[in-house]
Amino acid sequence: MSDELSQLDELIESDGIYRSLYKNKFEDSPSTKKTITKSKSLYVPRFDDEFNSSLVVDSWYKKSLWLYLLYPFALAVSYFTGRKRRKFLKNSLKKYKSEVPIIIVGNLTIGGTGKTPLVKYIATELIKLGYKPGIVSRGYGGKFKETLRVTNETPVKQTGDEAQILSTLNIPFYIDKNRVRALKTLNDNHDCDVIISDDGLQHYNMNRDVEIVVIDGKRRFGNNLSFPAGPLRESLKRLDSVDFIVNNSGPTEDGEHLMNVSPAKFIHLKSGKSYSVEDWPMHKQVHAVAGLGNPGRFFDLLARLGFDITRNPFPDHHNFISEDVHYLDHLPIIMTEKDASKCKDFDNNKIWYLTIEAEVSSKFMEKLDSKLKNLS
């Protein structure tokens, strides 16, 4: 096992695909500070790395046989994450304990499963039930130091894209590479009675009272192997210890709560004018743009709405530049809400974005409410 761990370290520390995937989905705060040298050269997207990365992810779900060459590394990751959790359970009393209940919304796989729409849904429903929720997040992709309070006026460059969606809730919301520090800041400055952590299932420095795992109902767990041979951050046995499993779009299995994600409205990025899905004001031949872990889900949604789309996929959390969406034709461009948040300053009048709303079966909120009441 020590040999596999040593080789895994080399694989992760190399400046390549697996380093990028690992840093995105496993690291919670930077361990070292690197000196950044500014350059006057024009920015050129690393499309080779992005393309190769998508090939690796696709291979996980196509169950490609070559991935078994990485099986020893997968065993090492599975061992490491299991040991990390066992250490947490053994020393949980020594970890930071929030004054109010903590709800973790996370997943077992690398890539997007719909955590942020679910966090928004849970927060909205808790407010309806009389709770005063707050939110903490890592703020992936944001450029900020220490703890940052996010409002609907905080620039996307500081917050990262996903935080922009949650900022519209107008509730206490803090981001920090160190989630525990964000928790402490929120508790010290606000009178919240429940806190939701967007992601953080594997962040065992943080105690938790409720664990919710979101799974992609279509792709599920791919080849069921741990990173880097597959998409799993932890063993599938981890599902036995969580409180709720929410299945994004189904089909569901026993014990899973179905979450449906529905299109809400189209919003023109420059003018802010909004239209219902039924009242789209232009022709339906469009460019569809998505920088998601699973862009196909967004493209399929537009196709079901009757659009004739040209697919333009980008990597998850892609930092868009104006050239990325500069198409020579005059077709409208439809993006996701989180991608559009990074294009507000572009001189492009063709960009629209589609807002979505998540909804989970009523029994889910009933059970969550009951569990929270039993904690008090």
Regions found by a protein language model. Name each.
Residues 1-43:
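C-terminal portion of ABC ATPase nucleotide-binding domains
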Residues 76, 116, 166, 198, ...:
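Residue-level signal for inorganic ion chemistry
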Residues 85-152:
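Walker A (P-loop) phosphate-binding motif
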Residues 131, 190-192, 208, 283, ...:
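Short, high-confidence coil segments that cap the C-terminus of an alpha-helix
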Residues 140-254, 267:
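Phosphate/Mg2+-binding loops and adjacent switch elements
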Residues 315-319, 350-376:
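Short, flexible loop segments at boundaries between secondary-structure elements
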Residues 47-101:
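A transmembrane-helix-recognition feature enriched in membrane-embedded lipid enzymes
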Residues 42-60, 220-334:
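C-terminal accessory "lid"/substrate-recognition subdomains
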